Each structure stands twice: as structure tokens, then as C-alpha cells.
Curated annotation (Swiss-Prot):
Organism: Frankia alni (strain DSM 45986 / CECT 9034 / ACN14a)
Similarity comment: family membership: Belongs to the HisA/HisF family.
Gene symbol of the encoding locus: hisA
Protein name in UniProt: 1-(5-phosphoribosyl)-5-[(5-phosphoribosylamino)methylideneamino] imidazole-4-carboxamide isomerase
This enzyme's EC code(s): 5.3.1.16
Active site residues of this protein: 13 (proton acceptor), 132 (proton donor)
Superkingdom of this protein's organism: Bacteria
Length: 245
């Protein structure tokens, strides 16, 4: 077994121009945490190397925060992973044009696999695919619809050359009930591509458990940070000393 460093991605979810957190990804469950740019700059100041930035309005198909999102990306000096509503060439190009280091494709990977294949061919590892899961069923369209069987889609995306997956247990997202480590192990058992974990982190011990899963390179942390369960410096300290196995 070897020591590994888990990359932490503090989340900034944007709805109607505000930084918010949802419970189980449901529209209408938002808790507001103020200005998205201020939140992103706080995470940068606290030591983040990545920020997970989500346009929830675009994800739910109810508009977008494109100008604000672009301002956040421009204003920080850390890498940004951008997600929400990226479903065609125009939205992909707009997301990449913000300067985001990486973009997450979700629904489109389920609904338009041919386009995703072409997008991966075109921009390579700047694309990660978000696999949002209930049990082993994928959730689409802002988590409001079923989108196919996890392992079938994963096999297809591996064959298409997808470089990275962001795996979210929808039932645990925003709930502070702990991550689904079994789900992460089941995914990393069938793909050699790196995985970023998302959903349910509530304590520093959860990050240690995630970091111990071989094949998981990062974890998105949202509500636990906003709710004060721990600080980002505390999280960075524990995830730089974990042994994988």
C-alpha cells in the first residue's frame, strides 16, 4: 500500500446568481450561502487547488448563470471543474471558453452518446463524465429522470476513451449522511480511469475512507464545508497523509 493525496474540490453550486446547496439534488431544496465569487475566493484562500463549479439553472434547464460563472473562473487562480447543462457543441465550447480546466458532461452522456464520443475525441481529458447514481441506475436531467444502467454506460464510456468519472450517489448528496464507499469500489473495480467522488461527505473520517479506495483521485465537498462540519485546511491536512489499500 502507498500513501496518496486525495484532491479536494470544494463545491460552488450557483442558482439564480447565488451560491446554494441542494438536498439530494432536488430543485426547490436550496439553502443559500451568498455570493458565488466570494465562496470561490474563500476556498482558494483556504488552500484549494480545484473548485467544482456548477450552474444549477443550466443543469435543470431553467436558464443559466453563464456570465457569473465565467467571472468566477476568471477571478480565481486555481483550476475549475465546471458542470451544468453541457449537452451540445455550443454549450461545451462556451464552458471551455471560460477557461475552466475541465468540464463535466452528465445528461448528454446518457442521451447522446455519439456526440459525447465526438466531444471526447475533440477535447480529450478536459472532459469528465458525471455518473449520478441511485442504486445502480443513472439519473439524468438534473436528476429528475432515469438514465440507464451504471455499468453498461460505464463500459461504453471507457470504450469511447473517457478520461475521468465524477461519481455521485444522488441519495446522499447534500444530506451529510456519509459517502457510498461501496459504490466507489464497485466503479473503480471495473475501470482504470480515475474517479472523483461526490455526495454525502459529513466528517473528516469520510474523506479518509474515500482516499483509501484505490482509483479514487478526488472528492467534491460541499455542504459539510458550508455547514461548518470541518474546515478546508483541516480536510487538506487529513487527505495528504492517507494510505490507500
Amino acid at each position: 500500500m502507498a500513501g496518496v493525496t486525495l484532491t479536494l474540490l470544494p463545491a460552488v453550486d450557483v442558482a439564480d446568481g447565488r451560491a446554494v446547496r441542494l438536498v439530494q439534488g432536488e430543485a426547490g431544496s436550496e439553502t443559500s450561502y451568498g455570493d458565488p465569487l466570494e465562496a470561490a475566493l474563500t476556498w482558494q484562500r483556504d488552500g484549494a487547488e480545484w473548485i467544482h463549479l456548477v450552474d444549477l439553472d443550466a443543469a435543470f434547464g431553467r436558464g443559466s448563470n453563464r456570465e457569473l460563472i465565467a467571472e468566477v473562473v476568471r477571478s480565481v487562480d486555481v483550476a475549475v471543474e465546471l458542470s451544468g447543462g453541457i449537452r451540445d457543441d455550443d454549450s461545451l465550447d462556451a464552458a471551455l471558453a471560460t477557461g475552466a480546466a475541465r468540464v463535466n458532461i452528465g445528461t448528454a452522456a446518457l442521451e447522446d452518446p455519439d456526440w459525447v464520443r465526438r466531444a471526447i475525441d475533440r477535447v480529450g481529458d478536459r472532459i469528465a463524465v458525471g455518473l449520478d447514481v441511485r442504486g445502480t441506475t443513472l439519473a439524468a436531467r438534473g436528476w429528475t429522470q432515469d438514465g440507464g444502467e451504471l455499468f453498461e454506460v460505464l463500459a461504453r464510456l471507457d470504450a469511447d476513451g473517457c478520461a475521468r468519472y465524477v461519481v455521485t450517489d444522488v441519495r446522499r448528496d447534500g444530506t451529510l449522511t456519509g459517502p457510498n464507499v461501496e459504490l466507489l469500489r464497485s466503479v473503480t473495480a471495473v475501470t482504470d480511469r480515475p474517479v472523483v467522488a461526490s455526495g454525502g461527505v459529513s466528517a473528516l473520517a469520510d474523506l479518509v475512507a474515500i482516499a483509501a479506495v484505490p482509483g479514487v483521485e478526488g472528492a467534491i465537498v460541499g455542504k459539510a464545508l458550508y455547514a461548518g462540519a470541518f474546515t478546508l485546511p483541516e480536510a487538506l491536512a487529513v487527505t495528504s497523509t492517507v494510505v490507500a489499500g
